[in-house]
């Protein structure tokens, strides 16, 4: 079904993620490696890989430098960072440097399976619990959101706000359609309108900028 490389220096975690893949995606071929050099070697031998699950802190990585090296050597193979890191800025940098997703090692099994499925379907996955971590503890004025001016948010319809809120929770278009009881094609149309109205180029920019919006306040309109 799929051909996936797990690059992580912890045998127990490799075994755990291996089981997630074989249970969630039967028939998939899974390869494993424990350092960046071996990962680079395997990607050179297997350019038909569908996905690389890359640990941020295994030998040879030097943080995000290893991701950059891997993307340079294998630019056509999607790479997902799988890490215990919880810093939102690191997540943002990983996406900026070419990762198509970021999965935390503390993710429940079902969430990890869903994240991998979203990525294999061509979507970008961001951990919703981290994306929404930088809310102020006090009540913020609606004009203070770091990502968007209030007039941009006010241009969104109620349904578009609901879709954007679901996007920040890490939901795929299919999940949003189910939860809002609308067609998936309608969700795609809303997402396109959201990106246009907010003047962003892609879904990731929208999600990262909208992570600390108080949707409840806007939806009271």
Swiss-Prot record:
<keyword id="KW-0805">Transcription regulation</keyword>
<keyword id="KW-0010">Activator</keyword>
<dbReference type="InterPro" id="IPR016032">
    <property type="entry name" value="Sig_transdc_resp-reg_C-effctor"/>
</dbReference>
<dbReference type="GO" id="GO:0000160">
    <property type="term" value="P:phosphorelay signal transduction system"/>
</dbReference>
<keyword id="KW-0238">DNA-binding</keyword>
<keyword id="KW-0804">Transcription</keyword>
<keyword id="KW-0319">Glycerol metabolism</keyword>
<dbReference type="Pfam" id="PF00196">
    <property type="entry name" value="GerE"/>
</dbReference>
<dbReference type="InterPro" id="IPR001789">
    <property type="entry name" value="Sig_transdc_resp-reg_receiver"/>
</dbReference>
<feature type="domain" description="HTH luxR-type">
    <location>
        <begin position="149"/>
        <end position="214"/>
    </location>
</feature>
<dbReference type="InterPro" id="IPR000792">
    <property type="entry name" value="Tscrpt_reg_LuxR_C"/>
</dbReference>
<dbReference type="Pfam" id="PF00072">
    <property type="entry name" value="Response_reg"/>
</dbReference>
<feature type="modified residue" description="4-aspartylphosphate">
    <location>
        <position position="55"/>
    </location>
</feature>
<feature type="DNA-binding region" description="H-T-H motif">
    <location>
        <begin position="173"/>
        <end position="192"/>
    </location>
</feature>
<keyword id="KW-0597">Phosphoprotein</keyword>
<protein>
    <recommendedName>
        <fullName>Glycerol metabolism activator</fullName>
    </recommendedName>
</protein>
<dbReference type="GO" id="GO:0006071">
    <property type="term" value="P:glycerol metabolic process"/>
</dbReference>
<dbReference type="GO" id="GO:0006355">
    <property type="term" value="P:regulation of DNA-templated transcription"/>
</dbReference>
<dbReference type="InterPro" id="IPR051015">
    <property type="entry name" value="RcsB_transcriptional_reg"/>
</dbReference>
<dbReference type="InterPro" id="IPR011006">
    <property type="entry name" value="CheY-like_superfamily"/>
</dbReference>
<dbReference type="GO" id="GO:0003677">
    <property type="term" value="F:DNA binding"/>
</dbReference>
<feature type="domain" description="Response regulatory">
    <location>
        <begin position="3"/>
        <end position="120"/>
    </location>
</feature>
<comment type="function">
    <text>Positive activator for glycerol metabolism. Regulates the expression of qedA in a positive manner and governs the expression of ADH I and ADH IIB. General regulator of quinoprotein ethanol oxidation and affects expression of ADH IIG activity but is not the sole regulator.</text>
</comment>
């Amino acid at each position: 079904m799929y051909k996936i490389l797990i690059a992580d220096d912890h045998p127990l975690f490799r075994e755990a993620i291996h089981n997630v893949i074989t249970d969630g995606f039967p028939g998939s071929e899974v390869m494993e490696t424990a350092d960046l050099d071996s990962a680079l070697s395997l990607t050179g031998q297997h350019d038909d890989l569908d996905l690389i699950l890359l640990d941020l802190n295994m030998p040879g990585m030097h943080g995000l430098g290893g991701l950059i090296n891997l993307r340079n050597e294998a630019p056509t193979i999607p790479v997902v960072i799988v890490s215990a890191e919880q810093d939102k800025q690191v997540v943002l940098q990983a996406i900026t440097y070419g990762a198509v997703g970021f999965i935390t090692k503390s993710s429940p099994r079902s969430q990890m399976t869903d994240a991998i499925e979203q990525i294999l379907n061509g979507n970008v996955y961001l951990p919703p619990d981290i994306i929404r971590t930088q809310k102020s503890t006090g009540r913020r004025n609606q004009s203070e959101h770091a990502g968007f001016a209030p007039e941009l948010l006010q241009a969104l319809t109620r349904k578009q706000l609901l879709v954007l809120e679901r996007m920040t929770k890490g939901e795929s278009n299919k999940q949003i359609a189910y939860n809002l009881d609308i067609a998936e094609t309608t969700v795609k149309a809303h997402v396109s309108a959201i990106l246009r109205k907010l003047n962003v180029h892609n879904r990731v920019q929208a999600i990262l900028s909208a992570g600390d919006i108080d949707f409840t306040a806007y939806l009271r309109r």
